[in-house]
UniProtKB/Swiss-Prot annotation:
Protein name: Large ribosomal subunit protein uL3
Record GO cellular component, one term: cytosolic large ribosomal subunit
Chain's role: One of the primary rRNA binding proteins, it binds directly near the 3'-end of the 23S rRNA, where it nucleates assembly of the 50S subunit.
Subunit relationships: Part of the 50S ribosomal subunit. Forms a cluster with proteins L14 and L19.
Originating organism: Parasynechococcus marenigrum (strain WH8102)
């Protein structure tokens, strides 16, 4: 049973299917993730499993975190995530979540931070058309009008303007696992996922699986 796993994006490649077609894929180094805490309905009000992933230096972990991780015998975990479950059967404190809990053909949702591009202009951030490049034009990459004048005398909230681009957490849903390599802790996922190589990813079983129902259908 797969509840979710943390991993690191390695990069993109291509995978050839049975028909010989090249399919773009993302390679993810996922787990093994140590189970660091079990929450039950009796003590916490809900059932959940907390896992840890990634190595770090000892001086970067404070004393409360060390005390929390000492219960599992592992003190140098960088990232902690929690997954809600219906019951705690099959989970043990100090156990591991591995890619073996997933299977080829399974649909997953992958969450991560998009690539940060810093302060960007209108064309790069929002895809605005640029102004004429001919002689006499002075608004090559300017935004143009950003609103009326005296009425309302202000810029409406949410107006698309230049600003920080990227660096936001998003979720790519319904990706298909093409291959599971338990020996090398690799997941081969069809398509692209957020972030650049080395970025932290949260892989969970897809919330929505199946074709979109037709209009008027059940």
């Amino acid at each position: 049973m797969s509840i979710g796993i943390l991993g690191k994006k390695l990069g993109m490649s291509q995978f050839f299917d049975e028909q010989g077609r090249a399919v773009p894929v993302t390679l993810i180094e996922a787990g093994p993730c140590r189970i660091t805490q079990l929450k039950s309905s009796d003590t916490d009000g809900y059932a959940a499993v907390q896992i840890g992933f990634g190595d770090t230096r000892e001086k970067l972990i404070n004393k409360p975190a060390k005390g929390h991780l000492n219960k599992t015998g592992e003190t140098l975990l960088r990232h902690l995530r929690e997954y809600r479950v219906d019951g705690l059967d099959g989970f043990e404190l100090g156990g591991s979540i591995t890619v073996g809990d997933f299977e080829a053909g399974q649909k997953v949702d992958v969450s991560g931070d998009t690539i940060g591009r810093g302060f960007s202009g209108y064309q790069k951030r929002h895809g605005f058309s640029r102004g004429p490049m001919t002689h006499g034009s002075k608004n090559h990459r300017e935004p143009g009008s950003i609103g009326p004048g005296t009425t309302p005398g202000r810029i409406y909230p949410g107006k698309r303007m230049a600003g920080r681009y990227g660096g936001k957490k998003i979720t790519t849903r319904g990706l298909t696992i093409l291959k599971v390599d338990s020996e090398r802790n690799l997941l081969v996922v069809k398509g692209s996922v957020p972030g650049k190589p080395g970025a932290l990813l949260n892989i969970r079983p897809a919330l929505r699986v199946g074709a979109k129902p037709a209009k008027g259908g059940q």
